[in-house]
Amino acid sequence: MVDPTFEPDNVAVKNQMREKYDSVGRSFLSNYKGRSRQAAEGMILSHGQPGLYWMEHKIDTAFAMGRFSRADRLLEVGCTAGHYTMKLVRDGYQVVGLDISAESIRAAQVLAQDLGLHTEFIAADVEDMRGVPDNSFDGAFSFSTLRYVPDPVSSLSEIRRVLKPGGRAVVDFPNKYCPWFEFLKFLMGGERHIHDHTYSTGQVKRMMQQAGFVNIHAKRIIFFSKGMPGSLTPLFKATDFVFERTPGMNYFAGIIMCKGEKLGA
């Protein structure tokens, strides 16, 4: 069972994560090189039908919890090659993408430029965003990122620092009680991501509190892997709709989505 016991050498952990996603960024650019603008559009949504459902369900849930609007300046923490950032910018939101991997950021910049999307991407460590001024954003969100960092509380504290007073952050973590993360994933041939950790809802809320957030609220969503057959996506969506709203059953959902606010001035 994976638990949030973090490796003592945080620098080594970060270097490994940076190297992993630098490789992802280089691979992305290599696959993209020479393709058309139409291909670039497709790469934003290159997740297949289940993956696109995951993307949209996470966005819809997070933006409802954070009450984010198109008038808000938003920060995406852990944007990798910018798929979520660019989808949202294309939909009229003001989003800045941030990632520890300079190569992933470079890939995001190339794709955004080719698509004519005007936004900013920053290569920075979420635990030390010293280049990002205090009180810069109305909101922040992070998907499938803080589960890998050596010190989630420091990361959450930095996210809180760059929010304006009254700003909201919505982050997600894998639910430690979901059977997928504990054994089903590996029975189906999935690989364990380096430095991955799972959490309970109580642990996530406590980390948000320790980072200084108030008005904390969490909900559990999604019961299926985005790697499932696309033909079953309508069934997954219907099942999620029911199970997420069923007490007891939602205890085993895959994702814990948690919202916190920065106390106003």
Where are these regions (language model features)?
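Conserved class I S-adenosyl-L-methionine
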Residues: 2-68, 87
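Class I SAM-dependent methyltransferase SAM/SAH-binding core
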Residues: 81-128
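A short acidic, Gly/Pro-enriched loop at the edge of an enzyme's catalytic core
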Residues: 127-139
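A short glycine-rich, Lys/Arg-flanked "PGG" loop and its adjoining helix->strand segment in the class I
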Residues: 153-165
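Conserved beta-strand signature within the Rossmann-like core of class I S-adenosyl-L-methionine
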Residues: 166-173
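Short, glycine-/aromatic-enriched active-site segment of Class I SAM-dependent methyltransferases
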Residues: 175-195
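A C-terminal cap/extension of S-adenosyl-L-methionine-dependent methyltransferases
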Residues: 183-189, 206, 216-265
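Short alpha-helix
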Residues: 196-211
